[in-house]
Amino acid sequence: MEYQLTLNWPDFLERHWQKRPVVLKRGFNNFIDPISPDELAGLAMESEVDSRLVSHQDGKWQVSHGPFESYDHLGETNWSLLVQAVNHWHEPTAALMRPFRELPDWRIDDLMISFSVPGGGVGPHLDQYDVFIIQGTGRRRWRVGEKLQMKQHCPHPDLLQVDPFEAIIDEELEPGDILYIPPGFPHEGYALENAMNYSVGFRAPNTRELISGFADYVLQRELGGNYYSDPDVPPRAHPADVLPQEMDKLREMMLELINQPEHFKQWFGEFISQSRHELDIAPPEPPYQPDEIYDALKQGEVLVRLGGLRVLRIGDDVYANGEKIDSPHRPALDALASNIALTAENFGDALEDPSFLAMLAALVNSGYWFFEG
């Protein structure tokens, strides 16, 4: 299924992206759910899938984490089932992510899907990432507040909420409506009837993650082996003093590594192309031989990217799931990065190069791409 998003992107980016929340009425016309509540509940029974149940009764909140064995204990009100990265495990839902590729792939994270019964929700809270919340089956009331300093508290160890807030948006969403919320705006949603919601979340690494990730890269490659030296050690009034110029020199030693463009590019490509959630990787058995890949493509078969696989381009280099893809065939690499589905035409002359075919076979045999059907 193909989803057509009714949105003036230039206007949206100028007025709302990372600035102001907005309700996009009928963002998807004639919206059809790509997954049923039963299918979602089935996914939450799988150990590889990240899921949780959130419920509340008389002001008391409960959170439990999957995999779940049964839902028989649940009542008819006040609970939600939330499943992360459903686009990794259920191919039809991945189609919901594609209309949002007007925004950079490296910023898109995953598709979280929730099923809620009347009164179900997770309470008023803040997120530090952008999110588009698509209303599927059913109706849900959403309230969004102004971006202010707000106290957060934990009504349950696994649930972070904010105090009640005054709403700047108070809307009832119907199938196909979309609520966009930038980082830091408090919000809460409660189902008015059995309801499905689809949250396209965006990824924004913080400074701590970046420094930690780069430090891992430095350690793995044994970079930064230069030692501090001070042949012109300056005199000081007290032997315990560390002088400002020494602090500057130490900081420069660290910055020197970050300021090497090739290393920084290689690290960031590996770092940002890794998914934060497990992928449904299923290497083919038996593995494909390069000539089988060639024949299949030439016969018109379509090669499809695994749901949730992050394929990103930095300059001329392409990265997939933390690995750099090496090949001199730039147009073919661009096709891998740009297209979800690929045909022989996308690869062009690269298919006549045995080394490219061997590389493509390795990617398919890793489970990163698969033949449709």
Curated annotation (Swiss-Prot):
The keyword Oxidoreductase applies. Disruption phenotype: Cells lacking this gene grow similarly as wild-type under standard conditions, but show reduced growth under low nutrient conditions; this result correlates with a bulk protein translation rate that is lower by a factor of three or four in the deletion mutant strain than that in the wild-type. Deletion of this gene also leads to loss of uL16 (Rpl16) hydroxylation. One of its GO terms (molecular function) is protein homodimerization activity. GO terms for biological process: post-translational protein modification. It comes from the Bacteria. Its EC number is 1.14.11.47. It catalyses: L-arginyl-[ribosomal protein uL16] + 2-oxoglutarate + O2 = (3R)-3-hydroxy-L-arginyl-[ribosomal protein uL16] + succinate + CO2. Residues 92-219 form the JmjC domain. Pfam families: JmjC_2 (PF08007), ROXA-like_wH (PF20514). Fe cation binds at H125, D127, H187. Gene3D superfamilies: 50S ribosomal protein L16 arginine hydroxylase, Chain A, Domain 2 (3.40.366.30), Cupin (2.60.120.650). It is an enzyme of class 1 (oxidoreductase). Keywords: Dioxygenase, Iron, Metal-binding, Oxidoreductase. SUPFAM superfamilies: Clavaminate synthase-like (SSF51197). Its cofactor is Fe(2+). Binds 1 Fe(2+) ion per subunit. Substrate binds at S114, H125, L126, D127, R140, H187. Growth-regulating oxygenase that catalyzes the hydroxylation of ribosomal protein uL16 on 'Arg-81'. Homodimer. Belongs to the ROX family. RoxA/YcfD subfamily. This is Ribosomal protein uL16 3-hydroxylase. It comes from Escherichia coli (strain K12).
